[in-house]
Amino acid sequence: MIPMIYKEMCPNCNGEITSERLAIGVCEKCLKEENVFEKLKLCEKLREEKTLKNLKDYCIIWNEFKEFEEFVKDLGFELLSIQKMWAKRVLKNKSFSIVVPTGVGKSFFGILMSLFLAKKGKRCYIILPTTLLVKQTYEKISSLTEKNNLNIRVVAYHSELSTKEKKEVKERIENNDYDVLITTSNYLTKNMPKCKFDFVFVDDVDALLKASKNIDRTLKLLGFDEEIINEAYKIIYLIKIGKIEDAMKKREILKKKISKIKHGCLIIASATGKSYGDRVKLYRELLDFEIGFGMNKLRDVVDIYDEEFSKEKILEYIKLFGSGGIVFVSIDYGVEKAQEIEKYLLENNIKAKLIHSKDKKGFDDFREGKIDVLIGVASYYGVLVRGLDMPERVRYAIFYGIPKFKIRLKEYINSLKEKGELKEDINIEGKTEEEIRQIITEKLKIKNFSLRKEDDEYLLLIPDVKTYIQASGRTSRMTEFGLTKGASIVLVDEKEIFEALKKYMLFMYESEFKRIDEVNLEELIKKIDEDREKIKVGRAKGKVPDLLKSVLMVVESPNKARTIANFFGKPSVRKINNRNVYEVCIGDLNLIITASGGHVFDLVTKEGFYGVKIENNLYIPIYTSIKKVNGEQFTDQKDLEELIKQLMEKGERVNAMDAKENIEIIREIADEVDAIFIATDIDTEGEKIGYDIAINALPFNRNIYRVGFNEITKRAILKAVESFKKGEELSLDENKVKGQVVRRIEDRWIGFRLSQKLWEVFNKNYLSAGRVQTPVLGWIIERYNEHKIKVPYLSLKLENDIYIGKIWEDEFDKDEVEVEVKVYEKEIPPLPPFTTDTLLEEATKRFGLSTDEIMSIAQELFELGLCLTPDTYVVLGDGRIETIEDIVNAKERNVLSLDLDNLSIKIDTAIKFWKLRYNGNLSKITLSNNYELKATPDHCLLVLRDNQLKWIPAKDIKENDYIAMPFNYKVERKPISLLNLLKYLDITDVLIEFDENSTIFEKIAEYIRNNIKTSTKYKYLRNRRVPLKYLIEWNFDLDEIEKEAKYIYKSVAGTKKIPLFKLDERFWYFAGLVLGDGSIQDSKIRIAQTPLKDVKSILDETFPFLHNWISGNQVIISNPIIAEILEKLGMRNGKLNGIIFSLPESYINALIAGYFDTDGCFSLLYDKKAKKHNLRMVLTSKRRDVLEKIGIYLNSIGILNTLHKSREVYSLIISNKSLETFKEKIAKYLKIRKEAFINGYKTYKKEHEERFECDLLPVKEVFKKLTFEKGRKEILKDSKIHIENWYKEKTNNIPREKLKTVLRYANNSEHKEFLEKIVNGDISFVRVKKVENIPYDGYVYDLSIKHNQNFISNGVISHNCTYHRTSSTRVSLDGMRVAREYLKLNNLEDYLKNREYFMEGAHECIRPTKPMNTDELIEFLKENNIKLTKNHIKVYDLIFRRFIASQMKEAVVEYEEIYIKDLDEKVEGYVDIKFDGWSRIYNLKLKKLPRIEKSSLKVLDKKLRKIPKVPLYDEGEVVKLMKERGIGRPSTYAQIIKKLLDRGYVVKSKDKNKLIPTKLGIEVYNYLINNYPHLISEERTRELEEIMDKIENGEVDYIEVLKALHEEILSIR
């Protein structure tokens, strides 16, 4: 923990407290002990010490909450996490709204809290929407009071009471004879109870708000009178008509009145939270909360489209998806088409029912499964679109045509005129359809639409997005068990309208439509069904899972908080200390979002050494909360009070703010929630803000986590939350915090010390100096002095409109100039995307805005809102070998990677999965073993080059490079039981039979009796057999079942029962026989082309319970289960299943031996040159994937191999260098060809007397640098290691095993250390045979690995996809996606050329977060009621176009160079554009020149005049200089220039906004540079910037830096 002192931040005494004591909870004065106490224990300790102060109210609440928890436990229940949060709010008497899904316990919470408060003598009122709910709630409460002997009077009124009962209940209500009252909202409308309530719980706000006066009634129930309600409504009206200042004045008066009223607590609960009208805002004015209607944007729907539009397609998808669908017919086809579709489906045996406003029958039958599909018209207020909420039943939706609006074109034009939105008169009478289309596009600014003519009138058709969202949302609902998955299939009837729908879905909901053939429907249906099963099973158990957790997310700005909250619907809002706190439900998190308002603390001014306490060689910053009065910042309380006093004496308005209030808000919410997310910006400043928040929230909540996102989009927020759930949360980086601390202290020390000197000299106490601003001021002065120097300048106008100018001393009297012209084709690459400095430079020039304005605009815009080909094999942590595409899609997390410290292969974690559309050249690298790797040019591989291991990009790999290859390493592989293999392969339609003595079956039988309601349970119990799929579903341990199961078989007539067999070496050897030369047809497995009797004998031994027979040249065995296992393992077709390589080594080796015995070969080949035989060991296949996977595995157990191809057949050849290892590990499992191997082995060994070497290492150049003591080489000779021969041999290779021995005798050196690391490591090397560039258009994939940042790809070590953020031009994969989607939406896919602009350790560039151009942004802003200025639009347009251009192909131009000999100058530009490329989006910054075809040009005009030697700087040019010279940071560029302007050191010229130093600025600079050059020089400033960076990287001790800075400051005299 970093030592810091926070003034006035002790939660108890409001005194100063250290960061260490904040971790304990209170300061030393309050409690001497240093133990961390539980909250109630802390209260007890403070009471004992008699120091309990500010925490007293919290202690009361904590104690009451404990009481409530115990009360609920005594009733026999446990509070859910979310209920605990609600309880704490009620106990604080804070009113609020609950917007959560049905079933998470909100109604029951209302009951529990009412009983608890009633027990304490308080009066409670539960308001429900229906009589049924009133009855059920009354029965529940009555049952609880009776069972637990609670003396609580409960009264319930409802319409089903008898006349006598109604009279009695009304009398009791009239006489206040109750503690808890329960009625419908309808009762409240007609009968207003007279007494005041302490707690009112409204369950279902929609029913309450049917009568808007009920809002007033609820407020009166709480103790507010008519007068105060009317005053509150007056404020609402003033705000509505724009009289904000008047409203604020009245609000201040109202707040004082409310503070004197002891009112009750109101909870408004709803699953939808729809609220209408102005009166509902009374809750905001009087109770500090607003009702939200969250979850309408919460959807997990796969949006699919099919361009085949027909009834037949509806039938096809219903048959595929099954029961539980809705068919929505586009409104323009009407009910008649819906009836036609109903009839068609019924005729095809689909149980379908049409639902519409006049016929709503069918809902219950659909719920019960008697109807499979409902049909309705896609209308926003249709009964199916809005009235259906069956998450357990509705699985998918089919849209027959795109939901659309039909608008009469004439009426639409007239309505625009009436609203004043159409300035010119538009007449469509007598126009052709083509002309009308042009009017709609150009005048009405509608891009995607359809035009129809009905009854001589044109209809405009545009997509009805809200209806689509609402209707498709029926398939994905938030429930107590989480958000369900749904599918939506749109049958496209109008392509133009569909394009508009796609855009809207992308912009508004960040959802991308997928073409039907891009979706794995089998997986989708499986996930949909899993979610429904979860609801079914969960509700059957009758217990609400504790899924919904409450989390406080703290961001920096209120804008950002609001934007994030609005991603998920209209949030509920609470006002705490006059600040908005937003609340939304996002799946299983109840997210509460608030803002810190940026930095909360700053250094004090009047304590320590300029705000730093120095003691015991420590430098401890003393912080206090930032205070502002009318925008002016203070840290000293006395200064603040003095200013307020002065303003009040002058009668001026005082707008005061203390950032401490933000911490108090955070602390209050922290006490309520389960956890806190620190979501400040991920940079140095954001890290310090986050650290301050975290440390000050600690006394109230210890579950604090860091989350981060580099763009404000729904996708990014959900991704950050998902990362946290997976355990990938970030932590606050203390090094960054230390960097910020030092930067601020240094700025304070130098600023205060030098500023005081300036005050003394110039007698102006507003002057300031700083280490960065002073050099920058110097540049502006230096430029100004140069500008004053005048030089002669000649400007010529030549024929053909050629202009040229040059500094020219002499007269120029020529009438003609000689020219040389070159014209050639030239590719012009786009500029990279903007960084902070380039944006400031460009935007200041273009728009004349200040850097400060542009930074502010960019911030507000922000707040709104390397890879491999898919066939690359990656080795997983359990040994499985799968394609990277499958790994990314399945998000497999455990992979093998290389620990670079000791070169050992270890299990690591994939933390990010990348899938990117790529169109460009790939590097195809072919290795000497003929394995191949295809990668994007920047994908890095581990290469031995220049005697070092280096990461080299694929584009820079050369022939004869050596790439690191994992070799002979250990993997923890595990056996798999038969039943678990069946589960893995999804072969679950098999029956398991148990004998009479089975104890496990008794457990199964008990489960069946208790949980299975259908008659099939008797069949299971009677026959003692159960389908495997149910045993899996019921979560029984399959390994335990396998121990006692008697038989297994398929429920097909004639299928033989077989005993459960072991998947041991014998089974996997058999599998190898089939892999080599077998075939599978139905249940029969045939093995051919081998000694048949031998095979038959092997099968007899492996499967003694099955008959096998010889037929022709084949041995046949039949069993449907074994046949399906082999089929799904890929033994004959498809992919060889990667699970094989997760089995124990002996099993895989037996499989490979079986393969050799059917389709392998052992033969001796005579080498005439060496006069010796080589042993050829080879496997063959037409399937490359089989041999590649086996080869990768063989390398892992130390067997070298190469891959060859001849015609269509592949061969895997085992290297003779690995003969001994092959004999030891594979050959012992051979049966049929064992003798052939042994004979070959004996011959080879006899002729090759030297000991076999497993592998050779290409390290001779490093080896040659070793030194040996005298006599040691002789010792090695005795061991038959002649290293002198190694020096002579031409090869670079050295035998690994011999090198190990040699290294024991070598002298110690870095070279020895390097070689020892390699020989003892888990790698060898493979030579690069060939490198090619190949075109590619498709997806590429990558992984981000947590620790080692590499993985095994196609048998070599491959670097992962790293992703860091800083100010740079780097484009992330998300950025590339935005560009790709924009170009695709605008039919510019051919222009795409993704570029990463890679920068090591870099942040991302400035870019848009949505594929939305400026016109679309304006439309988006209108629809979402977001107001931005024209300058915002300009800056966005600039950023957008520059970014999209950076991801497009080069422009190709006919380039012209005109060399003017007489002036020795060139004019350059383009004559013609051959291919526009990126210039289609962004300006081509080249002159357009005429084609010149002669050798001289006439001078038409000439001028010789005096001009300034250099132009003055503008703000953008100064920013560029700061970047180039390493002064300042992106976040401070604009601030530095603003400070120079504010201090009066610099002014801007009126005409061109150029920077001009003032007399004061020049004098201040001269004084500083003459007296303190060592402190404010450019070099010293740059040096300090580098030191700060080192602190942030953990390379330098920040205390030592502060010590040095302190000494430097003390030198100022």
Curated annotation (Swiss-Prot):
Cellular compartments per GO CC: cytoplasm
PROSITE patterns noted in UniProt: HELICASE_ATP_BIND_1, HELICASE_CTER, INTEIN_C_TER, INTEIN_ENDONUCLEASE, INTEIN_N_TER, TOPO_IA_2, TOPRIM, ZF_RG_N
Domain Toprim: 550-712
Cofactor(s) the protein needs: Zn(2+); Mg(2+)
Matches recorded under Gene3D superfamilies: 3.40.50.140, Hedgehog/Intein (Hint) domain, Homing endonucleases, P-loop containing nucleotide triphosphate hydrolases, Topoisomerase I, domain 2, Topoisomerase I, domain 4
Keyword flag Isomerase: yes
Main location (coarse class): cytoplasm
Ranges where the DOD-type homing endonuclease domain occurs: 1070-1199
Entry's cofactor comment: Binds 1 zinc ion per subunit.
Binding residues for Mg(2+): E556, D681
Organism superkingdom: Archaea
Keyword DNA-binding attached: yes
Domain Topo IA-type catalytic: residue ranges: 733-1613
Signal peptide: none
Pfam family, one: zf_Rg
Subunit structure: Monomer.
Note on domains (UniProt): Introduction of positive supercoils requires the cooperation of both domains. The helicase-like domain probably does not directly unwind DNA, but more likely acts by driving ATP-dependent conformational changes within the whole enzyme. A beta hairpin in the 'latch' region of the N-terminal domain plays a regulatory role in the enzyme, repressing topoisomerase activity in the absence of ATP and preventing the enzyme from acting as an ATP-independent relaxing enzyme; it also helps to coordinate nucleotide hydrolysis by the ATPase domain with the supercoiling activity of the topoisomerase domain.
Role, per record: Modifies the topological state of DNA by introducing positive supercoils in an ATP-dependent process, increasing the linking number in steps of +1. Binds to single-stranded DNA, transiently cleaves and then rejoins the ends, introducing a positive supercoil in the process. The scissile phosphodiester is attacked by the catalytic tyrosine of the enzyme, resulting in the formation of a DNA-(5'-phosphotyrosyl)-enzyme intermediate. Probably involved in rewinding DNA strands in regions of the chromosome that have opened up to allow replication, transcription, DNA repair and/or for DNA protection.
Protein's UniProt name: Reverse gyrase
Organism: Methanocaldococcus jannaschii (strain ATCC 43067 / DSM 2661 / JAL-1 / JCM 10045 / NBRC 100440) (Methanococcus jannaschii)
Lineage of source species: Archaea, Methanobacteriati, Methanobacteriota, Methanomada group, Methanococci
Gene: rgy
